[in-house]
């Protein structure tokens, strides 16, 4: 019982109880009236007759009370035919519809297709091999699609569609957007998937609501046929059932040898046209046929004969069906096709081998011709060299002509067999004889033209060839012939000249010699001359140099070598700085010679090295000069110490000069100014002129420093306070000695008693303790007879009031200042 809202109730009714009590009994189903009206349905005796099961309706129960009825004798019973009944004579074998009442006298017979006997009629009466292999359905194929024809239910469906607005010949839908022609089923041969046998054919048929005759007439008017032609059927291998033609010509298409070979070629194409090699050994299970088949890979699966996919009509199988014979025939066909494909593959392989052998023959013939030509060239080279060797004493010109011919006439053999090595036994003795008496420092151009000619003939450095031909090479053979001639023929003379050379007096001669021969020498020979001959000789002369006694300054004969030696000369710089530091210990800042001595090294040493050297050796001397400078203009009107100090701004950073001016000059300057201002009868105009003259002497680069500017401002404040009558000096002013006009005399103040100076060893010991460094002698280690000490992690020794430290970077002993020593010790510990 359904509710009003359309939902079904799950309550238990009488039918459920009856089914539960008697599960094995016959179940009663509701008829249409019972399902509609339920318990209000009218009772009827035919209820049991209308109810049915899945097997069909029950037979009506015979009613005992009903009168007995008889069957007429003219009605067909079983397989008997009543001759008086015209309907039983209608041989409607084609499955056509029953004629109407007005056509009862006509008998329609369809001879277009054979009738099939019922399965029970075949039996054993059919000859063996001719019976059907399967029971066919009893449905008539001509009744298929009868709904599309204009009879029966089709008229009712069409009338209903026209009542809803459908127009014949147009698409379905409100706007007619539906398809006009229905989808037609087209039989595909074989059992493969869509697209397995090429492009799918398109079937044509009648439109919705159109009969077959109308569709045929329409397609005839459009120039097409409603069915595929015989040729199309033959090409597609299909046989359309239910064809409207009475007869159809069946043509047999035979497979040719070309078709079989084409299949073999497609299966044996290169890997670029086949599937990947990873699929070659995959197991393939074919379940498209009646029996399951297993293939070793996709290649073997593609080699199946096409006959396996050909379909056989069920109608043909009813005529002839012997599976064993069909299997044997198919097996013979497969073996034959396999033999054809194998023979074709062998033929193709033989053709490929023939082509490869022909190509190899051509290459061998070509190689043979080339080798014969090379053999002839080698024979000619041998004859040329053998003829030259017969000459006992060849000249230099004859040797040059020989090698020119070898390079021009036999270039391939010259490079392949390194024929330039022939020059070693022939040309080298001539070169040694030519340069045996040569003095390079006296005649630097001697033999340059000759060596330049041999370089053009023998040198192959452009090609990058450096070794001779062959596998059994000695150490001497690894050198090119031209380099070996230079090494053994010319370099001995240059070595003798370098051993006798004095770098301080013959600097220009050696530089000109090296510059003249560098373009003619290889890079490694030039490197050998500079590092093994020139630099050691310069280092030896630097060790002998004494800046206090030598008349020729070292920079005059050493600095010009920078262009040729470059960084190689840096090895002699530490001894030079060490000796200059010793020479500057007794230097007087008023001596201008130090400026000229150090000026050439400003661009030779690095900026940091040069600044450190000035800070250690020059700046302390300048500070002492400013500290002892006389400020009284009557006694020192020009102040040469100040001028000498300001000249070093060219070589050092202004910070260093500003520090010594602030430390040594301004305290004395301010003290002198205060004494003068506090003296009785002071002339402020003279004081202002004296102050202005000193301010003008200070360079602007120093005035910009805050410490210098602050000291000048302090002096101006003192002058201003003195003008107001205040005492600006902390000490009582002493009387000023009379000064002769016009230059005013500055007051002479009493110098403080000199403080007792500490020794250098005591200063180093005090500095080490103040900064937390260890300071003690090293066991059994001396430098030039002096004890070496540990200063933190550094090694130092004292010599003539000078501290020498082992440079941790250059590993040489060099002089060092106290501040630099502290910084180096801190860096070594950090």
Curated annotation (Swiss-Prot):
PROSITE patterns: G_PATCH. The keyword Nuclease does not apply. Detected in muscle cells from body, pharynx and vulva, in neurons from head and tail, in pharyngeal gland and in tail hypodermal cells. Residues 1-17 have a biased composition (Acidic residues). Keywords: mRNA processing, mRNA splicing, Nucleus, Spliceosome. It is found in: Nucleus. It comes from the Eukaryota. GO terms for cellular component: spliceosomal complex; U2-type post-mRNA release spliceosomal complex. GO terms for biological process: spliceosomal complex disassembly. Residues 153-199 form the G-patch domain. Pfam families: G-patch (PF01585), GCFC (PF07842), TIP_N (PF12457). Residues 1-122, 196-244 are annotated as: Disordered. GO terms for molecular function: nucleic acid binding. Identified in the spliceosome C complex. Can assemble into large rod-like polymers. Belongs to the TFP11/STIP family. May be involved in pre-mRNA splicing. Required for embryonic development and survival. This is Septin and tuftelin-interacting protein 1 homolog. It comes from Caenorhabditis elegans. The gene is stip-1.
